[in-house]
């Protein structure tokens, strides 16, 4: 049946900011849905608070709202735009929860809006654990023994029935948030208390433990005529007990017999029928007991999910696009498969002739004190996917694509260490982020496959594969480079060994292995992902490498090509913002007639969508892999400055190998990154910098620190996201940093900078084409200097800086761009103190603020800069004027502290945010209030506020206290702060710090006395002492600020109404044109 004609306009709900458990796979699905529905002639309205997404680009929908995904705000959008239907299955758990709330509040009924893609009843039946259990029993499928609890008493009663260990999961949360495994009553009570708090319905599901069972997922698509297809089966390499988002997964499933696969296939279709999903994709998760084969259904998601993004990339079947078309009434047999050029209908189940491996990427090093063991609560921040012809090839490609310093199965422990075996056994039994490497170490240390299986419950089939790779490594180490004859080397390359890994084993440089391959003429061929195992011809160039005979790449000979290197797996400090820039580069250069080639290995992103570029190579972004693609494609230019640190690290080596790197030269990049060379440029331009020094030994550091003066910012050179960066307050602190945080040497110097306390930090994005400099935007940070720029909220235009100061910055940016010979994007960070401008750093590449600035000003900076790199000047493009919008845009960050209970949520020079939201308003206050609502912070307009500030903030705190009083707050203060306020005639209630006797601050927070807390600290001792305030505020959901500037911004926003007015991006940009 063709599409519905009773619907003219559709509202798509996005997923909001990137958090652990809900990443950019929903930008990928949302962008596909927008395209698919507009193709069919529908008017598309989109709401998503995350500016770093492709789907919020003004050309993706007819009306785009970068507004909080909150039912009251969405109600305003519905009232204004009057859509006929709402599609909630593209924006993850956020969108589903929002849609259910709109239904509950009667908004959909009030404005006559139909829900498409899923019914409220189907969502509820899948998400409500009790209804789901009943539904499964009805169709004869088994579920885990479980019970539901809404209070601690109920929970304990369920535990008595289910027994220990048991698994606790809160309802309606994402990525297992708040859940865990309890082995005893004490752990059980702790997890339940947290879970009840985090579930929006205060509901817990308590299950019997399935730890050690095998876990599988089926990606299913079903239409209203009951056509049902399995897009892909996915097997978890790690057994149950580790969240599927944190498990290594493999597609298609490797260890099922055909009979078991058919049983699971039929069961998953039965689940969709029973739940009532009839227009879209779902994923169904199963567990199998390896001892007796008992099969149970764990859960199903009635929406597009993380796994469906993986399944789409693994098979080439665009699940989100198909689901969007099914939602408006099409059936599978009416839709054509794009990848085969319409030679097959969408009702054909994809078949694949390769193996796909996904490995999660973790960032525990950012969270001191976090529990880094893997459990049922998701903790990974990104993932990498690799494709190979065998399990071994695909696994080894994924390992090197992860960018954690491994080129394959690099050893984690030295076997000479007497503790080695103990450590290996511990790591296998209680999995952390690196377990896969410890498995290889276990085989090196002489454990048998059975021995490893007993510790890990990982299927023996997978273990045998790894054991074989370890034995081959031993052979390479034994024979050395002279023993690598053509046949042996080909065998190793077929099993996925990287040149760099073989070089390490043979004790030579990587270049020597490459030379050897050239001698043997041993190079990879490229195979296509075509959904049909090469049964039909394909027009889509979606490729992966493998060492076989026949190459299917067929590169064009007569076209100018530009290759864009992507950013690899998401991680903190390098996220979706960089992917956004890569996509824009590809789109702009395609429009200009170039053939574009994308190289990336992140399955969640839009850049790895088969129709974003002309040609897609799904490969690790490493020197070896990139050089092999260049060998075949011979591009005219390669762009390295858009994918963050990943491709930048390769710039010099690529240039040395004769690859045409376009844009800012690798040498110029080095001039900005290398401290000494940069210093020369700054001196020549006579710019001011905070006093600084570069040191290569601890005693030298102590001497230099005396000259510069404390406090100091200390960090290793060449880092992204502020890794191992700290503020130190005295010599003892400095010595501790050198002993614990870094290994310093001539090759790895450490930088010392005078820390400008209380300075205002500013970010400037600009583009230079060699003749002129375009200022993209000047952003004033809300948190003062010392908080990593990626963790600070910021405002465009600036909300306190004078015009003169901004002009000084404009001139300095221009001088720097010419001095460093920038071609393309650059980002400069300044600090302003006592009306003086200090230069902090320059990055001659795309910065993470580019998408935000583009949305705020309407200038697509990444596209403009890509054209500059390809040789088109700013004047030719007609983009020469800095745009200062007639409204305020505020970017606010989203932090993952709720996933890491042991971590202090104090902001500092290490970046820890996972995502961002944007708020727009006529005043700074309104924009800031919207950004707060978008980032889910719970701001109360009145109540009792607690003030506890450091020495340096005591002058300004009086002004803040007066503002809070005027707003109607009652005030509490700790001793030192209370004295200062008392002198100014404000008399707060005095409260005890934790070590001053009870009732103390923590008691009062627990009793719910506060609606707002401001706590600023300086100095290691004070930070340790006050950590309990910040953790308690987070745990009991009290809005808190850890900087005074944040406090002032918050008080300004208290009087603004974040839900009163909604403005689309298209309307915003029209206002700019008028002004």
Curated annotation (Swiss-Prot):
Residues 937-1075 are annotated as: Allosteric domain. Binds 4 Mg(2+) or Mn(2+) ions per subunit. Residues 133-328, 679-870 form the ATP-grasp domain. It catalyses: hydrogencarbonate + L-glutamine + 2 ATP + H2O = carbamoyl phosphate + L-glutamate + 2 ADP + phosphate + 2 H(+). ATP 1 binds at residues 129, 169, 175-176, 208, 210, 215, 241-243, 285, 299. GO terms for biological process: 'de novo' UMP biosynthetic process; glutamine metabolic process; L-arginine biosynthetic process. Pathway: Amino-acid biosynthesis; L-arginine biosynthesis; carbamoyl phosphate from bicarbonate: step 1/1; Pyrimidine metabolism; UMP biosynthesis via de novo pathway; (S)-dihydroorotate from bicarbonate: step 1/3. Keywords: Amino-acid biosynthesis, Arginine biosynthesis, ATP-binding, Ligase, Magnesium, Manganese, Metal-binding, Nucleotide-binding, Pyrimidine biosynthesis, Repeat. Mn(2+) 1 binds at residues 285, 299. Mn(2+) 3 binds at residues 829, 841. Mn(2+) 4 binds at residues 841, 843. Residues 554-936 are annotated as: Carbamoyl phosphate synthetic domain. This is Carbamoyl phosphate synthase large chain. The gene is carB.
């Amino acid at each position: 049946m063709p599409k519905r004609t009773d619907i003219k306009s559709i509202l798509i709900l996005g997923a909001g900011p990137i958090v652990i458990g809900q990443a950019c796979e929903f930008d990928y699905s949302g962008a596909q849905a927008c395209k698919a529905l507009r193709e069919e002639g529908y008017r598309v309205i989109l709401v998503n608070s995350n500016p770093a997404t492709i789907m919020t680009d003004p050309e993706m929908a007819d009306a785009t709202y970068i507004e909080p995904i909150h039912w009251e705000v969405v109600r305003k959008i519905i009232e204004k735009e009057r859509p006929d239907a709402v599609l909630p299955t593209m924006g993850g758990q956020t969108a589903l929860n929002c849609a259910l709330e709109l239904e509950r509040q009667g908004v959909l009924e009030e404005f006559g809006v139909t829900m498409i893609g899923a019914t409220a009843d189907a969502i509820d039946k899948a998400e409500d654990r009790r209804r789901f259990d009943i539904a499964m029993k009805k169709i004869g499928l088994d579920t885990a023994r479980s019970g539901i609890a809404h209070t601690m008493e109920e929970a304990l009663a369920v535990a008595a029935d289910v027994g220990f260990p048991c698994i606790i999961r809160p309802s309606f949360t994402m990525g297992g948030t708040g859940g865990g495994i309890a082995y005893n009553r004490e752990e059980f009570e702790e997890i339940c208390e947290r879970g009840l708090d985090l579930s929006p319905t205060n509901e817990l599901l308590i299950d019997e433990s399935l730890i050690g069972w095998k876990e599988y997922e089926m990606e299913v698509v079903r239409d209203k005529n009951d056509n049902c297809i399995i897009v892909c089966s996915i097997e978890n390499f790690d057994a149950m007990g580790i969240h599927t988002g944190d498990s290594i997964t493999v597609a298609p499933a490797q260890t099922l017999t055909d009979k078991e696969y058919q049983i699971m296939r039929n069961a998953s279709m039965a689940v969709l029928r029973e739940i009532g999903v009839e227009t879209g994709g779902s994923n169904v998760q199963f567990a199998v007991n390896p001892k007796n084969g008992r099969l149970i259904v764990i859960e199903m998601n009635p929406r597009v999910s993380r796994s469906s993004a993986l399944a789409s990339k693994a098979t080439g079947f665009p699940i989100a696009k198909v689901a969007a078309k099914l939602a408006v009434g099409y059936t599978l047999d009416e839709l054509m498969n794009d990848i085969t050029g319409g030679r097959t209908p969408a009702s054909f189940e994809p078949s694949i002739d390769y193996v796909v491996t996904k490995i999660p990427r973790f960032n525990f090093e950012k969270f001191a004190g976090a529990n880094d063991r893997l459990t049922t609560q998701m903790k990974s921040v990104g993932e990498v996917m690799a494709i190979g012809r065998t399990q071994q090839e695909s696994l080894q490609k994924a390992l090197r694509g992860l960018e954690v310093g491994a080129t394959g199965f690099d050893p984690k422990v030295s076997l000479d260490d007497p503790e080695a075996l103990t450590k290996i056994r511990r790591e296998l039994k209680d999995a952390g982020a690196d377990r896969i490497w410890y498995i290889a170490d276990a085989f090196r240390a002489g454990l048998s496959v059975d021995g490893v299986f007993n510790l890990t419950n990982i299927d023996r089939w997978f273990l045998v594969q790894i054991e074989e790779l370890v034995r081959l490594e031993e052979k390479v180490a034994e024979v050395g480079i002279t023993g690598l004859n053509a046949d042996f080397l080909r065998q190793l390359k077929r099993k996925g060994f990287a040149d760099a890994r073989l070089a390490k084993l043979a004790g030579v440089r990587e270049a020597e292995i490459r030379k050897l391959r050239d001698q043997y003429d041993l190079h990879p061929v490229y195979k296509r992902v075509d959904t049909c195992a090469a049964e039909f011809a394909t027009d889509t160039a979606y490729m992966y490498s493998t060492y076989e005979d026949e190459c299917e790449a067929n590169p064009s000979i007569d076209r100018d090509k530009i290759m864009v290197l992507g950013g690899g797996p998401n991680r903190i400090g390098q996220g979706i913002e960089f992917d956004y820039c890569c996509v824009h580069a590809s789109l702009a250069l395609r429009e200009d007639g170039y053939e574009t080639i994308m190289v990336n290995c992140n399955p969640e992103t839009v850049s790895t969508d088969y129709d974003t570029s002309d040609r897609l190579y799904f490969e690790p972004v490493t020197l070896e892999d990139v050089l092999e693609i260049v060998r075949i494609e011979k591009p005219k230019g390669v762009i390295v400055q858009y994918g963050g640190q990943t491709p930048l690290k390769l710039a010099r080596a690529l240039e040395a190998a004769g690859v045409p790197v376009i844009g800012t030269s690798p040498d110029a990049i080095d001039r900005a990154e290398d401290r000494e060379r940069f210093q020369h440029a700054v001196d020549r331009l006579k710019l001011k910098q905070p006093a600084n020094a570069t040191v290569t030994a601890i005693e030298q550091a102590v001497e230099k620190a005396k000259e510069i003066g404390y406090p100091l910012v200390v960090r290793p050179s060449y880092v992204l996201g502020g890794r191992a960066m700290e503020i130190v307050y005295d010599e003892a602190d400095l010595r501790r940093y050198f002993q614990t945080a870094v290994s310093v040497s001539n090759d790895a110097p450490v930088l010392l900078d005078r820390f400008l306390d209380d300075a205002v930090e500013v970010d400037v994005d600009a583009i230079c084409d060699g003749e002129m400099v375009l200022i993209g935007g000047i952003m004033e940070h809300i948190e003062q200097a010392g908080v990593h720029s990626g963790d600070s909220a910021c405002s465009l235009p600036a909300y306190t800086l004078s015009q003169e100061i901004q002009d000084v910055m404009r001139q300095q940016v221009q001088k720097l761009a010419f001095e460093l010979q920038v071609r393309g994007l650059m980002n400069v960070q300044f600090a302003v103190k006592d009306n003086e401008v200090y230069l902090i750093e320059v990055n001659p590449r795309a910065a993470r603020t580019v998408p935000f600035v583009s949305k705020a000003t309407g200038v697509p900076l990444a596209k403009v800069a890509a054209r500059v790199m390809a040789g088109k000047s700013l004047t030719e493009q007609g983009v020469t004027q800095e745009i200062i919008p007639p409204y305020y845009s505020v970017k606010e960050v989203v932090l993952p502290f709720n996933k890491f209970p042991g971590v202090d949520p104090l902001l500092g020079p290490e970046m820890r945010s996972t995502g961002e939201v944007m708020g727009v308003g006529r005043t700074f206050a309104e924009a800031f209030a919207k950004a707060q609502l978008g980032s889910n912070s719970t701001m109360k307009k009145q109540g009792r506020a607690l003030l506890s500030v450091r020495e340096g903030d005591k002058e300004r705190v009086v002004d803040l206290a007066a503002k809070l009083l005027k707003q109607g707050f009652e005030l509490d203060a700790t001793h030192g702060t209370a004295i200062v306020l008392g002198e100014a005639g404000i008399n707060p209630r005095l409260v005890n710090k934790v070590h001053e006797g009870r009732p103390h601050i923590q008691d009062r927070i627990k009793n719910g006395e506060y609606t707002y807390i401001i706590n600023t600290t300086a100095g290691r001792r004070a930070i340790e002492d006050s950590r309990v305030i910040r953790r308690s505020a987070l745990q009991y959901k009290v809005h808190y600020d850890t900087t005074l500037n944040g406090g002032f911004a918050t008080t300004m926003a208290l009087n603004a109404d974040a839900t009163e007015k909604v403005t689309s991006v298209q309307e915003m940009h029209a206002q700019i044109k008028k002004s």
